[in-house]
Each structure stands twice: as C-alpha cells, then as structure tokens.
C-alpha cells in the first residue's frame, strides 16, 4: 500500500518525468505508444529537452513505417517528419551541449530526404552532416550519429553528376566534395562496432560494401543480421531486405 501511495506521490510531483518514463518503458517496438507519452510530457512542459528529443525519435519511427507512395500517405509521412523536426530543434534550443538533439535532427531530416526528389535531398545535406558531426563531437561513442554520417557519405557519393552540380551551386564547390567512400565505411563500421546487435547498422554497411564491389564483406554483415534479435519496429522489414540482398549477391565475386 505504501509503495502505491509513494508512486502516486512521485507522479503528482513530477508528471513530466512520469510520462517520459512511461514512454521509455514502451520500447522501440512501440513508437506510437512512446510518442503518446512524450507528447503528454510536452503538453505539460514544451521546453523539456528529454521529452523533445525522444518525441522526435518516436514520431520519426512512426513515420518510417509508412512505405506507401499513395499521395495521402506520403503527405501524412512528411507531416510527421515535419513535426519531428520541430521537436528536434526545440531540444537543441533547450540544451545544445548534449548530443541527442543534434542526432535526432540529422536523423529526421535524413529519413525525410530519402522520400524526396534529388534537389530537395541535396537541400537537407548540409544540415544533416553538420548536426550528425556535432553529435559525434560531443560523444564519439554515439553509434546512431556515426550511422547518419556513414549514410550521408554514401548517399552523396551515389548522386548523379547533375545532382552533384546542383549541390555545388547551392553550397559552394567544396562542401559536397567532403563525401567519400572511406568515411562511409569507417562511420558505419564504427556504428557496428559500438552496437553490434543493431540490425540497420549492418544492413547499411552491407549496402555500401555492395556499392564498392566488396561482396564477401557484404555477405558477412547480411549473415550476421539473420541471427540478430528484433529490437526496432522496422527490424522485421530490415531482416527481409537483408535476406533479399543476400540472395541477390550470393554468387557475386569481389571486384578487384
């Protein structure tokens, strides 16, 4: 009885912390439940650093599940990412010395950019790079930010000549020239080393190895994925994608 009274007292004293804790306990397999609690915390204190960055992550995890190209669903997905950007920017305003706000802004815009055409994707490139870099500068072990940076290098290297010309016109000649395959591999390898059970780290690294013709290394990552437990709402789809990619490259020989 005393423990129940104590718990109710703590909730009354700090309802923001209570909602954040409830969101955390829902886990990454239930981002919709997480988002409900983080938004409840923000309804009480819209400046909460923790509630804002976690709400940005959760709403992005809800949005990433919308894979349809139907116009109404694309608008829904983009609107969720737009709200996620607001949350991430509020988190940075609340405390720019911590890495999470910088990471979630880079992540939200990175995911949004992958749903857009080439010109719009290029427009987000500098913010994504700068914010992920800040997160890693603050915490060099932030594996999720390393993933964003690795993906950034790979995505820029995959741009066509025209797209890179547009990027240079927008940002100046030097910025997009930062992108290189070595850093794509290095950051994604770092992400895998720091979080070896993270399925999407390994999948993205495998895709980069395929780009580079390093099929044996890609297969190593894809085989590892098959044995990993599901931890994220998108992991079942990631596992399917990994299995399909493995089948596609199963007999490929490494390029010299």
Task: Give the predicted meaning of each segment.
Residues 2-10:
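Sec-dependent N-terminal signal peptides
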Residues 9-21, 255:
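Cleaved targeting-peptide boundary
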Residues 15, 162-172, 196-199, 219-221, ...:
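Terminal, low-structured helical/coil segments at or just beyond the last alpha-helical repeat
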Residues 18, 22-37, 58-97, 105-141, ...:
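Short coil/linker segments at helix-helix boundaries
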Residues 182-224:
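Glycine/small-residue-rich hydrophobic helix-like segments
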